[in-house]
């Protein structure tokens, strides 16, 4: 039988003596744990980390002790080192009570917002993005390009920055960085990636380093950079925004699909203007391979000029640089027209010695129609019934343009100032465009002011502006509707 062993008898004094050190130890440990887990207050004050929304590239903020470096691994010192040093500065009490400390919180604008990067030929690349406008206006940021090959080698290149938005930028301005190497950095076709260093100022010590483009092994094809190209003509549309009329988009698309022919392609950029109704009228053309719609709605996070128009047209220019012989830039309330029986092929053949040409507009009224009871206006297309042209001359009007993209480094909304080659402006007898301003977002009936039939033969003053009758576009409507029906099988009889 197992015997119970009684515990030794201890006095109360001894128990208390042993318990007190244990309790003190536990309290001390608890206090240490609490202090350990407190958030680093001053570290938060000076943290340079920023949220990364919709960024897919790897970014490293680096600090250089010298501008001479040999490899990607050797020339980075984490910015956290500087952050820690700054934390110590804020933690210490200034010895001089009159010395003020400036503590930054957050970031007002990014140093660089990458939209796209594209190979521009065997030895050149273009990186397109946004950058803080104050930095470029008041500072001297600069860039450096590097190609890191999959075979382990690397090569650096000169970088030239272009600011193509004519000073219209707001918080952000558009930046196109051209990287030109002495030879093809992927000549062995093993693949690699293009790295961009974006410097904050003249000093080479602080910059952001990120990947802009990657080429897989075997993907490089030099034949893509010389004719024949995939298309004869490419349309690069600006940012589509607002409450766009699906009817106006359908008319515009049918007309220009006919005008440019089967070897053409249209690129639209949806900044909020491609509603389900607009998407529905574009969908048949998308399925036919004639249209691409790119979703750029996230551009609204970056305050640039007019829905970042300059950013969008530059991205389109470089993305499709070798896709077509000619790239056209104009809006969806504008219709390209060839007067005097000209053909597009003959006109562009004549203009081919120029890198770009600009196009003069015929400004049309958005409200004036003929009061004709025989016309069923609600069923007619916009350019079928808006037939009055502003007849003022010798005033400056905005022009649109077409460009041989292979010879352009950057572009604008109305023309490019960064090209190799000549620009032709005297084109009005060969090609023009009809501009139906203030119609693209009108969903109700366009004919809101009626003029008598006699207005066809005289000048009409409306809102103190002279208008004359011009039915050149109306004469094409039957042809365009038949073309649309043939291409898409669309019943246009009930079109409104």
UniProtKB/Swiss-Prot annotation:
Give the originating organism.
Arabidopsis thaliana
Q: Spell out the InterPro entries in the cross-references.
A: Glyco_transf_92 (IPR008166)
Q: Which UniProt keywords apply?
A: Cell wall biogenesis/degradation, Glycosyltransferase, Golgi apparatus, Membrane, Transferase, Transmembrane, Transmembrane helix
Q: Which residues form the GT92 domain?
A: 232-464
Coiled-coil blocks: none
Q: What is its EC number?
A: 2.4.1.-
Residues annotated as transmembrane: 22-42
Q: What does the protein in this record do?
A: Involved in the biosynthesis of beta-1,4-galactan. Can transfer galactose residues from UDP-galactose to beta-1,4-galactopentaose in vitro. Forms specifically beta-1,4-galactosyl linkages and can add successive beta-1,4-galactosyl residues to the acceptor. Beta-1,4-galactans are abundant polysaccharides in plant cell walls and are found as side-chain of rhamnogalacturonan I, which is a major component of pectin.
Record membrane topology: Single-pass membrane protein
Q: What name does the UniProt record give this protein?
A: Galactan beta-1,4-galactosyltransferase GALS1
The misc remark on file is: Plants over-expressing GALS1 have a strong increase in beta-1,4-galactan content in leaf cell wall.
State the PANTHER family in the record. GALACTAN BETA-1,4-GALACTOSYLTRANSFERASE GALS1 (PTHR21461:SF56), GLYCOSYLTRANSFERASE FAMILY 92 PROTEIN (PTHR21461)
Its gene name is GALS1
Q: Which GO terms describe its cellular component?
A: Golgi apparatus; Golgi membrane
Q: Where in the cell is it found?
A: Golgi apparatus membrane
EC category name: transferase
How does a null allele present? No visible phenotype under normal growth conditions, but mutant plants have reduced content of beta-1,4-galactan in leaf cell wall.
| Main subcellular localisation | Golgi
Q: Alphabetically, which GO biological process terms does the record hold?
A: cell wall biogenesis; cell wall organization; pectin biosynthetic process
Which Pfam families does the entry link to? Answer: Glyco_transf_92
Found in which tissues? Expressed in root vasculature, mature leaves, trichomes, flowers, siliques and seeds.
């Amino acid at each position: 039988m197992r015997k119970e062993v009684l515990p030794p008898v201890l006095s109360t004094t001894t128990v208390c003596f042993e318990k007190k050190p244990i309790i003190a130890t536990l309290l001390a440990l608890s206090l240490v744990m609490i202090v350990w887990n407190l958030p680093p207050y001053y570290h938060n004050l000076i943290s340079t980390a920023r949220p990364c929304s919709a960024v897919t590239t790897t970014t490293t903020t680096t600090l250089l002790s010298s501008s001479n470096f040999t490899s990607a691994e050797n020339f980075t010192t984490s910015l956290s080192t500087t952050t820690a040093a700054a934390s110590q500065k804020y933690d210490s009490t200034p010895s001089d009570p009159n010395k003020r400390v400036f503590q930054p919180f957050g970031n007002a604008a990014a140093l660089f917002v990458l939209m796209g990067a594209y190979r521009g030929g065997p030895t050149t690349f273009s990186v397109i993005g946004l950058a803080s406008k104050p930095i470029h206006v008041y500072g001297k940021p600069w860039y450096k390009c590097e190609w890191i090959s999959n075979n382990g080698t690397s090569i650096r290149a000169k970088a030239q920055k272009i600011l193509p938005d004519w000073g219209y930028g707001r918080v952000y301005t558009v930046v196109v960085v051209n990287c030109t190497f002495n030879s093809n950095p992927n000549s062995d076709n093993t693949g690699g990636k293009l790295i961009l260093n974006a410097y904050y100022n003249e000093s080479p010590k602080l910059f952001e380093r990120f990947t802009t483009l990657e080429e897989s092994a075997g993907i490089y094809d030099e034949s893509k950079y010389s004719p024949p190209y995939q298309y004869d003509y490419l349309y690069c549309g600006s940012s589509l925004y607002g409450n766009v009329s699906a009817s106006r988009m359908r008319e515009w698309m049918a007309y220009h699909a006919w005008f440019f022919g089967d070897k053409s392609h249209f690129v639209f950029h949806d900044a909020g203007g491609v509603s389900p109704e607009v998407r529905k009228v574009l969908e048949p053309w998308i399925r036919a391979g004639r249209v691409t719609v790119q979703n750029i709605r996230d551009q609204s996070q970056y305050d640039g000029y007019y829905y970042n128009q300059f950013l969008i047209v530059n991205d389109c220019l470089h993305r499709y640089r070798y896709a077509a012989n000619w790239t056209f830039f104009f809006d969806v309330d504008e219709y390209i027209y060839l007067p005097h029986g000209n053909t597009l092929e003959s006109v562009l053949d004549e203009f081919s010695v120029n890198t770009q040409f600009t196009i003069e507009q015929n400004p049309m009224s958005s409200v004036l129609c003929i009061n004709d009871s025989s016309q069923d206006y609600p069923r007619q297309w916009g350019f079928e019934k808006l037939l009055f042209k502003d007849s003022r001359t010798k005033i400056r009007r905005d022009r649109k343009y077409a460009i041989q993209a292979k010879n352009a480094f950057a572009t604008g909304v109305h023309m490019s100032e960064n090209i190799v080659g000549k620009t032709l402006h005297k084109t009005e007898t060969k090609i023009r465009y009809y501009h139906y301003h203030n119609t693209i977002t009108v969903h109700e009936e366009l004919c809101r002011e009626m003029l008598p039939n006699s207005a066809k033969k005289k000048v009409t003053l409306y809102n103190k502006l002279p208008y004359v009758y011009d039915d050149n576009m109306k004469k094409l409507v039957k042809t365009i509707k038949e073309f649309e029906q043939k291409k898409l099988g669309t019943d246009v009889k009930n079109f409104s």
